[in-house]
Amino acid sequence: MAPFEPLASGILLLLWLIAPSRACTCVPPHPQTAFCNSDLVIRAKFVGTPEVNQTTLYQRYEIKMTKMYKGFQALGDAADIRFVYTPAMESVCGYFHRSHNRSEEFLIAGKLQDGLLHITTCSFVAPWNSLSLAQRRGFTKTYTVGCEECTVFPCLSIPCKLQSGTHCLWTDQLLQGSEKGFQSRHLACLPREPGLCTWQSLRSQIA
């Protein structure tokens, strides 16, 4: 692998020239879905400028991890995550960090590839302070309870039909036009009894 180097203006111009005209698009997931489908979920600060690998056109951000919520076994003997990797072009779903506040903490949910943390623009990356208290409770403790049995089932158009008793119908985008609606900010899809999952409030579980 070629060494990473600071992302210079010339590289930015090159990426802009060769980038396809159509940008990457994806449907933001419910936070529980993001947690369950990720290999690693951490809280971290972005502390360095992006560096690009000129051969692979991947870039990496230096981060300082402050908390890990998922991935202890997947990470193995590695005690820390120092970098997060992403495609260098937004058109192929590369994540571009907009904040210049290096003291701000972010919730990062990503995939591990060869021991490296990878994210895209479709990954769940959000300022920790922007999460509701219920979402923080979900990431720190509760979402994991629903990962094995339960599935958040997106409803994007009418009619919506559940395919299983273990599915919870997610209607935020249909009813409110945003993935940041009530179900996303305050509820988790959790087992009620064997073979049945329901939306349950996270607010009532906050100590």
Swiss-Prot record:
GO biological process assignments: cartilage development; cellular response to peptide; cellular response to UV-A; connective tissue replacement involved in inflammatory response wound healing; negative regulation of apoptotic process; negative regulation of catalytic activity; negative regulation of endopeptidase activity; negative regulation of membrane protein ectodomain proteolysis
Marked site positions, Involved in metalloproteinase-binding: 57, 158
Any Pfam family hit: TIMP
UniProt: Zn(2+) binding residues: 24
Effect of residue 32 to A: Nearly abolishes metalloproteinase inhibition
Signal sequence, renumbered to the chain: 1-23
Protein name, as recorded: Metalloproteinase inhibitor 1
Organism: Homo sapiens
Gene field: TIMP1
